């Protein structure tokens, strides 16, 4: 993978890019979750998928190698959406497929109205909600949830929090998750929590209901943070295959815990889109 950065409104945003892809294939833009980084996508980008498709994975402000946001607003969903759309503009990606994990999925939905020419969207670990009141139904209670919105986090707290990313009893080594969690600017977590609690995000139900592009919802069967029953109640015309796609045995991070299943589903979604430039 190639590492680079761009300036967006004076702020340096780092990103990784797969070394292959192009031709008539779509560009895939990968958006990581809370207290993670672009490197969570490294196995996907370094494998067959990254060799077929041009993949771009950004570090959100305050995460990975990107600079911290200039103010708390940069850690809200609108602030992150501005960073995402700014990156696409700087890299001249006109028709992306946006793939978002957890917070990254919420960002993808926030940005969708700003990306009318996007080819499609894929989210997982990211239930569409219309208001803060719906969060109690969409998200499952978990003892580690508090750390996801805390400025100061110990290594033990980060380890407990990242264990919620995988299925109970999973054999996946969460060391990389822990390192990224501890490297993230604490203000990113508190800023996100404060802004989301105050309702500073768009009506995601209305956004996905109005989409004309295909919109896939993937879900790890053993996700400890997201309520599958809530997801299954959602219906909207753009929903890919008409239902949530469940990955057996995986938790909140199926792209790392069930990489073959995840890549297969994502590849099927890309195939269904057809070549880049195909009229819909």
Predicted regions and their residues:
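Conserved loop-alpha-helix segment in the C-terminal half of the alpha/beta-hydrolase fold
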Residues: 48, 212-250, 256, 261
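Flexible "cap/lid" loop of the alpha/beta hydrolase fold
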Residues: 109-113, 117-151
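Conserved HGGG/HGGXW glycine-rich cap/lid loop of the alpha/beta-hydrolase fold
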Residues: 11-68
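Active-site loop/oxyanion-hole signature of alpha/beta-hydrolase fold enzymes
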Residues: 57-99, 264
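N-terminal cap/lid segment of alpha/beta-hydrolase-fold proteins
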Residues: 1-12
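Short N-terminal helix/helix-N-cap motif within the alpha/beta-hydrolase-1
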Residues: 38-43, 65-68, 132, 226-227, ...
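Conserved alpha/beta-hydrolase catalytic His-Asp/Glu region
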Residues: 132-137, 151-209
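Gly/Ala-rich beta-loop-alpha elbow adjacent to hydrolase catalytic centers
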Residues: 100, 104, 108
